């Protein structure tokens, strides 16, 4: 297990890139729109991990609601696991509250699921199973 990325919710991806890419000098590895989630994302590698910038593209998304309530800032911590199905099953048997009891697959082959902050001491935790070279 390792930290895959730390996600930061932003209202304007381009404005955020002015700081992270142009100011800090972090390279942009990937920019993608995830229609299912209603977000535009950018991954910027930092050592063996990434910063993920997440901008809502619709007002009815979880990220848009989060930004309205909290403003821009850290949204979640993502842990990379080798077998997400086994991890989710193990967490469920321990009574851990899962937002996604089953993994969701992105177009690039990455499978992910979220653990509810109530079970993770206030932190939204995402689990990632990377089956391709994306974001690693």
Language-model features, listed with the residues they occupy:
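Amphipathic alpha-helical segments
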Residues: 14-27, 91-94
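Vicinal oxygen chelate
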Residues: 42-43, 79, 88-136
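Short strand-coil-strand connectors
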Residues: 11, 45-47, 118
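N-terminal beta-strand motif that seeds the catalytic metal site of vicinal oxygen chelate
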Residues: 1-15, 72-81, 133-136
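Short, structured motif recognition centered on aromatic/hydrophobic residues
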Residues: 3, 17-20, 44, 51-54, ...
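C-terminal "cap" of GNAT-fold acetyltransferases
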Residues: 34-50
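Short, charged/polar surface micro-motifs in flexible loops or helix N-caps
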Residues: 47-51, 58-60, 84
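A cross-kingdom feature marking solvent-exposed beta-strand/loop segments within repeated
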Residues: 2-4, 26-36, 58-75, 94-111, ...
């Amino acid at each position: 297990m390792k930290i895959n990325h730390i996600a930061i919710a932003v209202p304007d991806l381009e404005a955020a890139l002015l700081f992270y890419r142009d100011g800090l000098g972090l390279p942009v590895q990937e920019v993608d729109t995830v229609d299912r989630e209603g977000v535009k994302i950018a991954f910027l590698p930092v050592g063996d991990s990434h910063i993920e910038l997440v901008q809502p593209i619709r007002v009815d998304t979880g990220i848009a609601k989060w930004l309205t309530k909290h403003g821009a800032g850290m949204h979640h911590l993502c842990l990379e696991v080798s077998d997400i199905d086994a991890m989710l099953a193990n967490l469920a048997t321990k009574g851990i509250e899962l937002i996604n009891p089953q993994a969701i697959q992105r177009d690039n082959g990455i499978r992910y699921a979220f653990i509810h902050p109530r079970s993770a001491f206030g932190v939204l935790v995402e689990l990632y199973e990377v089956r391709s070279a994306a974001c690693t």
